[in-house]
From Swiss-Prot:
UniProt keyword Phosphoprotein, yes or no: yes
This protein's GO CC annotations: nucleus; PTW/PP1 phosphatase complex
Organism: Xenopus laevis
Gene symbol of the encoding locus: tox4-a
Quaternary organization: Component of the PNUTS-PP1 phosphatase complex.
Residue window of motif Nuclear localization signal: 212-217
The entry's keywords: Chromosome, DNA-binding, Nucleus, Phosphoprotein
Residues of the DNA-binding region: 222-290
Protein name stated in the entry: TOX high mobility group box family member 4-A
InterPro entries documented for this protein: HMG_box_dom, HMG_box_dom_sf, TOX_HMG-box_domain
Basic residues composition bias: residue spans: 207-217
Span list, region Disordered: 160-187, 199-224, 522-547
Function text: Transcription factor that modulates cell fate reprogramming from the somatic state to the pluripotent and neuronal fate. Also acts as a regulatory component of protein phosphatase 1 (PP1) complexes. Component of the PNUTS-PP1 protein phosphatase complex, a PP1 complex that regulates RNA polymerase II transcription pause-release. PNUTS-PP1 also plays a role in the control of chromatin structure and cell cycle progression during the transition from mitosis into interphase.
Record's keyword annotation contains Phosphoprotein: yes
Length: 597
């Protein structure tokens, strides 16, 4: 192993039986040149406690003779040697970021003041016999600061006489050029690359504080009254500004303050009385404003026909639930001669949007929020304005079990609707009434089918309001069957009505009868409700021209897949559905029950 006086330094490893290294391999270390280092002398009082011999004494029994330098070399240059085992320096090497090479001698950058007259550098020779394979696997030069070494080992190598305190890794760079500066720079760049991402992660972990948004004041809220001094300031500011146009606000404030101090008590009382009167007015206005805030209900409706909702709600009787039905119908080709819809029509070809805002203070605990159910374009709301306008107390907002049953059945039927619009609403109801055949046994049986085929224009259902409960259904068959069939309803509760749409006659000749329900609401109800199913099969040559199924409309139907080619326009579909629904609601509100005669 030759170091001094040579341009190239070679380090031979003689460790026995290492799995990676052999005794013949040599490692080339970079040359530090032939420069000589001059260390300026530092005059300090000698202290026997600062001797290195005490530290060396602790490690005499652990040292390796092979690692000790030549005596002549030590005598000539005054080098103090400190032999330390690898077990003590392993932790230091790892924590300072450097890795030991094979047989590397670690030279301290900073000198240590000792009681000797010369200022010798301290060299640490690491014995290679106890090296572990993990450290031998690396061959990277490492420069260790003396202050870091002493702090990691817990050894006071120089006591309090260490020249430089522990600094951050970036402060170890010397401003003056030195032979070891290039190695140190490389180590510091590696250190920066390792520590830079950690600092970024720490900065990103901090969540920025979101500024609190100030609540906007209501412009309708009454303003607080001014104090007596503010009133005086407002009156005198204009006069002072007129005399001194260039006066600043601070100067004007000082002048007004001096004038207020010199003002008499009686004049101050005038301003104070004004303030008291303004405060009373403010309290009254504030109480009125809060009362309006509690009782105000803002209802904004974006619709094609805004006054349609109150007009429809005014027609429904008081006991029935307030239900607004808006149907979304796609546009189809309509006849130019179609009648214009009345002002009571709610639905339009475009879907309406309803926005209802109800303050929580008005509603009771059970109705803290307005219930809005939407399914297939049907919106059901109970706004508070309608209930209060009818004179109903808020305690009656809870619907009766009958109203809940009606609303629930209507919503269930709407949810079970196919995407295609079915105009007759009576076909969307559940629980069809059971029909019993009262004719003789030789007559064919009647079967109810739920899915209606294309409907014929000659078959009608006439429904009129009635006060007594009896309900009779008469079926007049075609001329092939001379005897009429009388079928009466067995179901006593008319919660949901389903009109049969087709009949199958298994007897010869087989024939299917199709019924088109058309509801005609009469103004004067007769004493009983008669529903007649008139099924006639005229000759094909005499079949009249088809018409719109809505009552009172004589226009021919328009081909549209959304209403089975039965209506002439969107308005007829809406009016037909509305009339049928209103007739059903009025029947339910009167508590009519079907009985069998």
């Amino acid at each position: 192993m030759e170091f001094p006086g040579s341009s190239d330094n070679y380090l031979t490893i003689t460790g026995p039986g290492h799995p990676f290294l052999t005794g013949t391999e040599t490692f080339h270390t970079p040359s530090l040149g032939d420069e000589e280092f001059e260390i300026p002398p530092i005059s300090l009082d000698s202290d026997p406690s600062l001797a290195v011999s005490d530290v060396v004494g602790h490690f005499d029994d652990l040292s390796d003779p092979s690692g000790v330098q030549d005596e002549g070399f030590a005598t000539q240059y005054g080098v103090q040697t400190l032999d330390m085992p690898v077990e003590m320096t392993h932790e230091v090497m790892d924590q300072t970021g450097g890795l030991l090479g094979a047989g590397l001698a670690l030279d301290l950058d900073h000198p240590i003041v000792t009681p000797y007259s010369a200022n010798p550098p301290v060299t640490i020779d690491v014995s290679m016999t106890d090296m572990s394979s993990g450290i031998l696997g690396h061959s990277q030069l490492t420069t260790i600061d003396q202050s870091e070494l002493s702090s990691q080992l817990g050894l006071s190598l120089g006591g309090g006489a260490i020249l430089h305190p522990v600094q951050s890794p970036e402060d170890h760079l010397s401003p003056t050029p030195s032979p070891t500066s290039s190695l140190h720079d490389e180590d510091m760049e590696d250190f920066r690359r390792i520590t830079a991402p950690k600092s970024i992660i720490v900065e990103q972990a901090k969540k920025p504080k979101t500024p609190k948004k100030k609540k906007k004041k209501d412009p309708n809220e009454p303003q607080k009254p001014l104090s007596a001094y503010a009133l005086f300031f407002r009156d005198t500011q204009a006069a002072i500004k007129g005399q001194n146009p260039n006066a600043t606000f601070g100067e004007v404030s000082k002048i007004v303050a001096s004038m207020w101090d010199s003002l008499g008590e009686e004049q101050k009382q005038v301003y104070k009385r004004k303030t008291e009167a303004a405060k009373k007015e403010y309290l009254k206005a504030l109480a009125l404003y809060k009362a309006n805030q509690l009782s105000q209900v803002a209802v904004d409706t974006v619709d094609l026909d805004p006054p349609a909702v109150p007009a429809l709600l005014s027609e429904s009787p008081v006991p029935s639930p307030s239900i607004v039905t808006a149907t979304s119908i796609p546009e189809c080709a309509s006849s130019p001669s179609a009648p214009s819809p009345p002002s009571q029509t709610v639905a339009a070809p475009q879907q309406s949007i309803a926005k209802i805002i109800i303050s929580k203070q008005i509603l009771p605990a059970g109705l803290s929020s307005t219930s809005i159910a939407m399914s297939q374009g049907v919106v059901t709301v109970i706004p508070a304005t309608v209930v209060t306008s009818r004179g109903l107390p808020l305690s009656q907002l809870q619907p009766s079990p009958q109203a809940q049953r009606i609303t629930r059945s209507v919503l269930q039927a709407a949810m079970q609707m196919p995407p295609r619009l079915q105009p007759p609403p009576l076909q969307q109801m559940q629980q069809p009434p059971r029909l019993q055949q009262m004719a003789p046994a030789q007559q064919p049986s009647i079967t109810i089918l739920q899915s209606p085929p294309p409907l014929q224009p000659m078959q009608k259902v006439r429904l009129s309001l009635q006060q007594p409960p009896p309900l009779q259904i008469k079926i007049i068959p075609p001329p092939l069957q001379p005897q009429p069939q009388v079928v009466q309803v067995q179901n006593q509760s008319l919660s949901v009505i389903n009109v049969p749409t087709s009949f199958e006659a298994p007897a010869s000749p087989p024939e299917q009868l199709e019924v088109l329900p058309e509801v005609v609401q009469e103004e004067s109800p007769p004493p009983q409700m008669d529903v007649e199913l008139v099924s006639s099969s005229p000759p094909p040559s005499l079949s009249p021209q088809p018409q719109c199924v809505r009552s009172g409309c004589e226009n021919p139907p328009v081909e549209c897949k959304d209403w089975d080619n039965e209506y002439c326009s969107n308005e007829c579909v809406v009016r037909h559905c509305r009339d049928t629904f209103m007739a059903w609601v009025s029947t339910r509100s009167q508590g009519t029950l079907a009985s069998v005669k």
